[in-house]
A protein has these predicted regions:
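Glycine-rich, N-terminal phosphate-binding loop of Rossmann-like dinucleotide-binding domains
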Residues: 129-131, 316, 348-351
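A glycine-rich (often HGG/GG-containing) alpha/beta subdomain
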Residues: 27-187, 191, 195, 371
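C-terminal-of-GTPase-core extension/linker across diverse P-loop GTPases
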Residues: 42-50, 54, 183-305, 322-324, ...
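Switch I (G2) and immediately adjacent beta-strands of P-loop GTPase domains
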Residues: 95-104, 110-112, 295-322
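Inter-motif core of Ras-like GTPase G domains
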Residues: 329-350
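Generic enzyme active-site microenvironment
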Residues: 313, 347, 373-376
Length: 499
């Protein structure tokens, strides 16, 4: 009924789900959820946007997509090679000029991509001109006056989704590629775009769908006495799904590191050389370095890439007892950074014996992923690795001079050992790098665990089907097979205009 969402699973699955909500009919054919009203709107409109980043550049691109893309391009881009873009050889570049009446705006190249073999699945024309902000603005304005409408955030990718060119997980991977902070993040995003995550999700959905079908047979035909055999099969199948989802969730923290970078806190007492170390790693003067203890009072964050993985370096205030209120706030932030860090670089002044503040810092490293740096080794060394291991356990210890750069290669090698695993794994193991996906897999796993408990307790098949159906629906939200339009809009609104 209108205003109520109805959910059903067909035994034949030619139409997997049907919703009737607020008068909108949605259905799932293969992998794509089609929103009928939106598709109808898209069939009538052609969108345009600047597809390149703001600012000056060698090349700027205006992208058109929709039923009238070729006709609009005919009005604004003129070439002597063809009379109309409908006659163009698809994917071939044509030299010409963007003109507004008698006014020539710029010269450039244009390419026509015929539906459905384009990014959006629609007719697409891309016009490449010089990357002048003014030339791009005038060309876009000309396209809009010629019948195009401004593209919304992520609308090109949204059309690709609605036209079945991409599923939702692949669409989100496009954004991950754009924002990748390192080689490992790019590799994993490319894997998601190629369908690795979608293939996993659809595999789980097929297994759940098969179980639901078999259980519904026992409900519809109780006289066949199939329930005992079916329950045994269901228990075995659910154990397999449980292990599969659990393993993927366990790797989600590594996935976050691949996508966002390794949160690395640089800690130590005042004047140990933390800011000098940050500057040495960045190879630029980012932090102020003085002989005055307590100079750094706020957390400075910068990124550096090691072996394809981004390290988010956090230079923190020196850890010590102080009556200075401002410095106390900085120290509290330093401790907070240390707690949320994936890796700790503990800087010790190696030119003087360990004091109580040093020992307290070293004690705090027990059980954490850390590297101890004996700094100021250009002076007379007063601390040995054995002194560190006696307090902090067997952590890596690197002796160096951040001021003069000696020993920095050894530190980078230790960092490489840590980041190399993420970089290597990113190319061969599936990770969840998106928090939305993590939460959905966790929710689906909860449903699977409840279904397993119901099987063990001998509950009726009806109860098990409820949890399995919810798990199936939740997994479908990752690829967009079972999502509602509000969430779809929310996801694509995070994209930039022109993508």
């Amino acid at each position: 009924s209108s205003g109520r969402k109805c959910f059903s699973v067909s035994p034949h699955y030619s139409v997997s789900i049907v919703f009737d909500a607020e008068g909108d009919v949605w259905y799932n054919g293969k992998n794509t959820l089609y929103f009928m009203k939106e598709q109808s709107m898209y069939e009538e409109t052609t969108i345009a946007a600047i597809a390149t980043a703001p600012g000056e550049g060698g090349i700027g691109i205006i992208r058109l997509s929709g039923v009238s893309a070729a006709e609009i391009a005919d009005k604004i881009f003129h070439t002597g090679k063809i009379k109309t873009f409908k006659e163009a050889v698809p994917y071939m570049m044509y030299f010409g000029h963007v003109t507004d009446g008698e006014k020539r705006i710029d010269e450039g190249l244009a390419v026509y991509m015929k539906a459905p073999h384009s990014y959006t699945g629609e007719d697409v024309v891309e016009i490449q001109i010089h990357g002048s902000a003014e030339a791009l603005r005038e060309t876009l304005a000309l396209a809009l006056r010629s019948g195009a409408v401004p593209a919304m955030r992520g609308e090109f990718t949204k059309r690709a989704f609605l036209n079945g060119r991409l599923d939702l997980a692949q669409a989100e991977a496009v954004m991950d590629i754009i924002s990748a902070k390192g080689e490992a993040a790019l590799t994993q995003a490319e894997s998601h775009l190629s369908g690795a995550l979608s293939g996993f999700v659809h595999g789980v959905m097929e297994e759940l769908k098969d179980l639901i079908t078999k259980l519904e047979v026992t409900i519809d035909y109780p006289e066949e006495d199939l329930e005992d055999l079916t329950m045994e099969e269901t228990g075995d199948a659910l154990e397999k799904i449980d292990k599969s989802l659990s393993a993927l969730l366990k790797r989600s923290e590594e996935g976050r590191v691949i996508r966002e970078g390794l949160r690395t806190a640089i800690i130590g007492r005042p004047n140990a050389g933390k800011s000098s170390l940050l500057n040495a790693l960045l190879q630029e003067e980012r932090a102020i370095v003085t002989d005055v203890p307590g100079t750094t009072r706020d957390t400075i964050e910068e990124a550096v890439r090691i072996s394809g993985v981004s390290l988010l370096l956090m230079d923190t205030a020196g850890l010590r007892e102080t009556d200075n209120k401002v410095e106390q706030i900085g120290i509290e932030r330093a401790r907070a950074s240390m707690e949320k860090a994936d890796l700790i670089l503990a800087v010790i002044d190696g030119s003087s014996p360990l004091d109580e503040e040093d020992k307290e810092i070293l004690h705090s490293l027990v059980g954490k992923k850390a590297i101890v740096i004996l700094n100021k080794y250009d002076l007379t060394p007063e601390v040995k690795a054995e002194d560190i291991w006696e307090i902090a356990g067997h952590v890596p210890v690197v002796s160096l001079s951040a001021r003069y750069g000696s020993g920095m290669d050894e530190l980078r090698e230790e960092l490489r050992k840590i980041t190399e695993k993420q970089d290597t794994d990113a190319g061969r193991i599936l990770f969840l790098t998106n928090l939305r996906h993590v939460e959905l897999v966790r929710k689906a796993l909860d449903n699977v665990l409840r279904a397993r408990a119901s099987v063990r307790e001998g509950l009726q098949a009806d109860f098990i089907v409820i949890d399995l159906t919810e798990a199936w629906k939740t997994m479908g939200e990752i690829t967009g097979d079972t999502m509602d339009d509000e969430l779809i809009h929310s996801i694509f609104s995070r994209f930039c205009v022109g993508k």
